[in-house]
Amino acid sequence: MEAAHAKTTEECLAYFGVSETTGLTPDQVKRNLEKYGLNELPAEEGKTLWELVIEQFEDLLVRILLLAACISFVLAWFEEGEETITAFVEPFVILLILIANAIVGVWQERNAENAIEALKEYEPEMGKVYRADRKSVQRIKARDIVPGDIVEVAVGDKVPADIRILAIKSTTLRVDQSILTGESVSVIKHTEPVPDPRAVNQDKKNMLFSGTNIAAGKALGIVATTGVGTEIGKIRDQMAATEQDKTPLQQKLDEFGEQLSKVISLICVAVWLINIGHFNDPVHGGSWFRGAIYYFKIAVALAVAAIPEGLPAVITTCLALGTRRMAKKNAIVRSLPSVETLGCTSVICSDKTGTLTTNQMSVCKMFIIDKVDGDICLLNEFSITGSTYAPEGEVLKNDKPVRPGQYDGLVELATICALCNDSSLDFNEAKGVYEKVGEATETALTTLVEKMNVFNTDVRSLSKVERANACNSVIRQLMKKEFTLEFSRDRKSMSVYCSPAKSSRAAVGNKMFVKGAPEGVIDRCNYVRVGTTRVPLTGPVKEKIMAVIKEWGTGRDTLRCLALATRDTPPKREEMVLDDSARFLEYETDLTFVGVVGMLDPPRKEVTGSIQLCRDAGIRVIMITGDNKGTAIAICRRIGIFGENEEVADRAYTGREFDDLPLAEQREACRRACCFARVEPSHKSKIVEYLQSYDEITAMTGDGVNDAPALKKAEIGIAMGSGTAVAKTASEMVLADDNFSTIVAAVEEGRAIYNNMKQFIRYLISSNVGEVVCIFLTAALGLPEALIPVQLLWVNLVTDGLPATALGFNPPDLDIMDRPPRSPKEPLISGWLFFRYMAIGGYVGAATVGAAAWWFLYAEDGPHVNYSQLTHFMQCTEDNTHFEGIDCEVFEAPEPMTMALSVLVTIEMCNALNSLSENQSLLRMPPWVNIWLLGSICLSMSLHFLILYVDPLPMIFKLRALDLTQWLMVLKISLPVIGLDEILKFVARNYLEDPEDERRK
């Protein structure tokens, strides 16, 4: 049934053809079940394990590696002699890498619990219905409830469907619907229609929503919608329709993979075609087929060389280390790739309650009457420090501390706050904080009483647990609460009837203490309290009181005001009818006005600084709240989102105002606005969508079930540690301390991680460029193989992998939060950097080939062949006079490969030092700024020595131990790469860098 809230109870009953007293007939139940289906949320069909495994092989680079492994495997079958074992090592290692990668990928996907499944926890098991086949109420499974059913709910029940209330069977009906609307206090419900068909859920005061809890009272209602038709069902559908986009880094790596795979394919084909003339060379036994296979193997080696196999592992490690650092700052990251996305966040959409504010209501102002002289009324105004539930703070008058016990009016005000109250404070020893027990508003009054300490109770020697309610206990010992007249909507107040305790010798009789909305309470006051006397409440005095309340309730503070009053001579208890709430109004008359307290949910202390940090970092903060617009704008001014006197006409909207704009203007509003008030969850998703259309990277906070679709849609969904399981499972990050400042710290960490990742991705890629150049040169010049695939795999995975991981520990730049967010479209490697890495890669390739050639041409223990013999080694036979006196086996010796590999590894270690900073010289940023990098270089070199000097590794890798002369040659060839990169950095710093960047550095 659509818009049930706007219809009368009679219309709702008529729509389903049902009687409130008897309920649906079995026939109607059957028909409605067929029409509307079961009252449950359908489970989401997850991917099968096999589908997840297949998904891991959709990446182009992975497919190329898989193809290379298969080809290597086939070629290994054709190997002869002692080469057979080494031939199988390469495909085996590649397959191991791919399997490990797939396992990690599948594990991560499986671990991301399903937010839709988490919604199930809000589905109640049972419901109580009236049906025509039974005289009394019956308990049935909640899934069998159908639209039209007459349902009964009572305190403690979970609402089984979306229900239009027909009758309230208690004084009041309070519902905790925070999971759905984010309202921190329970909501009082009624039965009258809400005539606005577009009312937001917060305003549908005659509806009960599926999954919410009855906090107090008992009611009867008719089921309007079930299953996916409910508000919680709509949230489920929104979440199911939201596709997870790839993070900017994943997109960059995908693009890079595609480009790389095209380049690899071209080079492999080129190498094979260049050497067609050599297929018949004698070294292949004159067999064209064997020649083709040989060059095919070289092409495969090229593919292996060009792909940075270690990259996925290094990225995962770097992100995992980042998440550990973030966890120490109270940001728990649930999805690894989102660590990097945080770095390009350009907009943070934050909830107000609990994130920007403490979510701990606190009284910050109060007033009592000081003097009434004719029409002149003077007030005593006080301010109170302390913005949490902790009983710590001072009462100030004109900014100077005062002792509240010296003011009779404050003693009475404290008495009303303590007695007209069902809440208390509790010290949570595990967390070391004071928490509320009961309603937030009442707990604020309890805390106020503790801060005022009107009877000067000695609290210094008390433990924190005893301190929690010490001053309230003193007041409760003086007066005994007899009974409570519950809050009701018509009078907007509640009261308690108290009698003096036996032990108290004070000459006071019974009293009624009242608290409630100022306009309602003051209208029923005939007197005002001045000191210990009461004087009549005249028109001018009332105007003065209401003027102050209006001033407090608007403007910068927008405080929530409560009026406190006493009925000095209430009727006798036996004369009062307590089971008829309609008569409570007549008992709460002839009141004496005592004072007013103004409270608010105060901003967190550290938020203002964090918002300034965001402004410096080019990040826009948008506050989104269910509160009214005035309160929202006031908090924005208080924390620095808006300036003190800034005009906010086109920068703050309510959900209704936003909906009334044409679509183009809605989109434009999202570009400007910094405050959205009175919003529904659907608005959050819409705002994210519009921001994404401007290529903004959005972080969205939320804690309720209602926030889950927007959390899932935003690039970074941030759930509160105190939030619902659904919000947490739909998000990428959870704030353990619910604090906005933690988001800013996480963004800073994300930026640092991206900078470091850029360094090691470039480091690994320049290494691969070097390997490709090496293989291409040997093939193009007709030289013997300098590096074989198994050696390339070792370098890519192990010796390069360790320094690359250590580069993730580079310290962040000092000005990291003074720059605007990077564009998600910014390429990983720009034009100049591409040239730089080609230059370095070219040197690496040439040096590696040069080291192998040096052994053939000049080494003492080498064959001393000439250059022509070296480039035509394929034609070497015993009969060929050009190779007279040369053993043809020498061209397959392991020494030149060892020289080439050692040069490659040493250059890579130098390159790792070059990667400490993109443009800073090693003289400005010495190696010891990252001690992890030095350690990893030592470890990589140790592993290189291991495969050179420890049997049987040299046989597997086709290597031979080097002597001192050869090592000196390796260093001579390798070290110039540092000088080359220093020259390139110098050019970048002085001739290419943006002057703005220069100034910032």
Swiss-Prot record:
Phosphoserine found at: 581
UniProt GO BP: apoptotic mitochondrial changes; calcium ion import; calcium ion import into sarcoplasmic reticulum; calcium ion transmembrane transport; calcium ion transport; intracellular calcium ion homeostasis; intrinsic apoptotic signaling pathway in response to endoplasmic reticulum stress; maintenance of mitochondrion location
Any Pfam family: Cation_ATPase_C
Sequence intervals crossing the membrane: 49-69, 90-110, 254-273, 296-313, 758-777, 788-808, 829-851, 898-917, 931-949, 965-985
Factors inducing expression: Increased contractile activity leads to a decrease in SERCA1 expression, while decreased contractile activity leads to an increase in SERCA1 expression.
Annotated residues for binding of ATP: 353, 442, 489, 515, 560, 625-627, 678, 684, 706
EC number: 7.2.2.10
Main location: endoplasmic reticulum
Disulfide partners: 876-888
Keyword Transcription regulation among record annotations: no
Chain intervals for the UniProt region annotation (Interaction with PLN): 788-808, 932-943
Cofactor(s) the protein requires to work: Mg(2+)
SMART domains in the cross-refs: Cation_ATPase_N
Binding site for Mg(2+): 351, 353, 703
Phosphothreonine PTM sites in chain numbering: 441, 569
Domain-related comment: Ca(2+) and ATP binding cause major rearrangements of the cytoplasmic and transmembrane domains. According to the E1-E2 model, Ca(2+) binding to the cytosolic domain of the pump in the high-affinity E1 conformation is followed by the ATP-dependent phosphorylation of the active site Asp, giving rise to E1P. A conformational change of the phosphoenzyme gives rise to the low-affinity E2P state that exposes the Ca(2+) ions to the lumenal side and promotes Ca(2+) release. Dephosphorylation of the active site Asp mediates the subsequent return to the E1 conformation. PLN and SLN both have a single transmembrane helix; both occupy a similar binding site on ATP2A1 that is situated between the ATP2A1 transmembrane helices.
Protein purpose: Key regulator of striated muscle performance by acting as the major Ca(2+) ATPase responsible for the reuptake of cytosolic Ca(2+) into the sarcoplasmic reticulum. Catalyzes the hydrolysis of ATP coupled with the translocation of calcium from the cytosol to the sarcoplasmic reticulum lumen. Contributes to calcium sequestration involved in muscular excitation/contraction.
Subunit structure: Interacts with sarcolipin (SLN). Interacts with phospholamban (PLN). Interacts with myoregulin (MRLN). Interacts with DWORF. Interacts with VMP1.
Protein's recorded name: Sarcoplasmic/endoplasmic reticulum calcium ATPase 1
Organism: Homo sapiens (Human)
UniProt gene name: ATP2A1
